[in-house]
């Protein structure tokens, strides 16, 4: 049986979430938590889908005439997009696993879409990479998930760190994280509707009138400074900008007690920076720390978060890990 295993990274928004909705800039980076997809040849007349992470399985006919239901629909949409590009649809089994918690704002869904697209096209002998991989995976995400921003898919396909503004092509940021510094991601375990938080924050900003506008303008200045800090490897400045950005997100109503507690603990335990990442009201916080402080910090955070992981950022994008025949 021929088969391929491909993986793609998750993402963190380091700066600018929420403000990006009104056309301001954000910085996103790839993380060392990855989604892995194994695609195997089968005999039969089905595409079989299995996600141990989500605990779901389904099978769909090769003519793609019906959906897979729920979370698995994105794979059908990717196959439809590939068929339009001239790829054939052959019987195969798909097994999806992710190191990221689902719906925590870490881009798990886009990473699995990208890894699947790469694995399947590699199985057929014409692997898609770079912009082509991005285009097809994004099409699947778009049909399955409404209006994704494209940040998650871009990071999953290309890796690295990007400066992003809605409606523009993302610009790469050459981030330099010196030895001896690490990031941690802490998941509150609280699920929330991104749409609800986004609508609430927009309402708050509107209510504040000119003051609201100024918060957005300040957030954009923070992004500008953060690009310089990343490129020069100035971790002390980067950390302070993270705390500052969190404060702005608190001001517009995106945080909650669980996130603020994590950020406060990080500050008390000497972390260089911490903030919520993504939509807020739950999901994850990101923390920047010196390597020597990690154990104490992690121990303390684990009492308040469902999951705490030490991660690398600015990692490579989608890649084929195994190809067996």
Description of each model-found segment:
Residues 2-15, 20, 28, 36-88, ...:
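C-terminal nucleotide
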Residues 62-63, 90-102:
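Glycine/charged-rich beta-loop-alpha catalytic/anionic-binding loops adjacent to active sites
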Residues 29-32, 279:
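A short catalytic or substrate-binding loop motif that flags glycine-/basic-rich loops and adjacent residues
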């Amino acid at each position: 049986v021929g088969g391929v295993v491909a993986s793609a990274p998750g993402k963190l928004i380091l700066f600018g979430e929420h403000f990006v909705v009104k056309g301001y800039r954000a910085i996103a980076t790839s993380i060392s938590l990855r989604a892995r997809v194994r695609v195997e040849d089968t005999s039969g007349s089905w595409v079989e889908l299995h996600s141990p992470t989500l605990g779901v399985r389904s099978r769909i006919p090769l003519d793609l005439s019906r959906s897979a239901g729920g979370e698995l629909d994105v794979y059908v949409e990717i196959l439809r997009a590939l068929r339009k590009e001239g790829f054939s649809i052959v019987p195969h089994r798909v097994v999806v696993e992710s190191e990221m918690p689902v719906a925590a704002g870490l881009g798990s869904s886009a990473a699995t879409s990208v890894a699947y697209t790469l694995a399947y096209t590699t199985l057929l002998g014409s692997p898609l990479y770079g912009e082509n991989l991005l285009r097809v995976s994004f099409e699947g995400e778009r049909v399955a998930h409404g209006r994704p921003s494209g940040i998650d898919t871009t990071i999953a396909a290309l890796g690295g760190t990007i400066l992003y503004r809605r409606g523009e092509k993302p610009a790469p940021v050459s981030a330099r994280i010196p030895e001896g510094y690490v990031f941690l991601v802490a998941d509150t375990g609280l699920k929330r509707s991104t749409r609800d938080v986004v609508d609430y924050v927009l309402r708050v900003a509107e209510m504040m009138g000119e003051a609201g506008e100024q918060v957005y303008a300040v957030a954009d200045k923070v992004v500008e400074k953060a690009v310089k800090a990343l490129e020069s490897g100035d971790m002390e400045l980067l950390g302070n900008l993270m705390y500052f950005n969190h404060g702005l997100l608190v001001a517009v109503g995106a945080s909650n007690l669980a996130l603020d507690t994590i950020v406060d603990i990080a500050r008390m335990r000497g972390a260089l920076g911490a903030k919520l990442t993504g939509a807020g009201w739950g999901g994850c916080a990101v923390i920047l720390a010196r390597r020597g402080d990690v154990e104490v910090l992690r121990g303390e955070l684990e009492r308040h978060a469902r999951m705490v992981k030490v991660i690398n950022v600015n990692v490579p994008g989608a890649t084929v890990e195994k190809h067996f025949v």
